[in-house]
Amino acid sequence: MPTKAVFRTARLGAGLAVGLLALAACTPAGVVVGGAASAGVAASEERGIKGAADDAVIRVKINEAWVKEDFDTFIRLNLQIYEGRVLVSGRVPDQAQADKAVQAAWQPDGVREVINEIEISEGGGLNDFANDTLINARLDADLLFDGDVDSINYSTRAVAGTVYLLGVAQDRAELDRVFRIARDVPNVKRVISHVIMKDDPRRIANPGNGGNSGG
């Protein structure tokens, strides 16, 4: 059975692969390297390569629908997707815009759940954006280098100081640790978790091995 040290090495390798992917993306050879790195990262996740690919398709289709409906919606909202579970967060000025965004999020094949965390507000401007960017960067780093967290199975996003968590936890202890790490990041106001356990029946059976579409 793999040890924690092995898992930690795999997570760090996945993180380095993401960094190499970003650096290599500007060259023709980088396309090949990037594809291999992406596949390596996806293979390390609970959802597997197929699950990650399905989620990527869902993301593209929702973003396309938002842009087509109203570009303002696209730039105001955030998407987190894991195994077909879609979390929509951000701020829009009216309820009608929020309703349309959620409706569009349900449309792609493979979407199994849409979690609506949209706030009706004009938004906080550049200060909130800068603060959220710092929170996201700090939280990503803290999770990546924590030896007791399989960070690759989590999606995190800060909106106006609120951190939203999505993904799959190995157990309750790991999720509690992720929650504490997020809460302790400077300027985080609250943490909202939509993470499910590895053995949760809502998960797709064998997501990395050709289960139901939805990733």
PLM features per residue range, with description:
Residues 2-11, 25-215:
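N-terminal targeting leaders
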Residues 13-24:
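Bacterial N-terminal signal peptides
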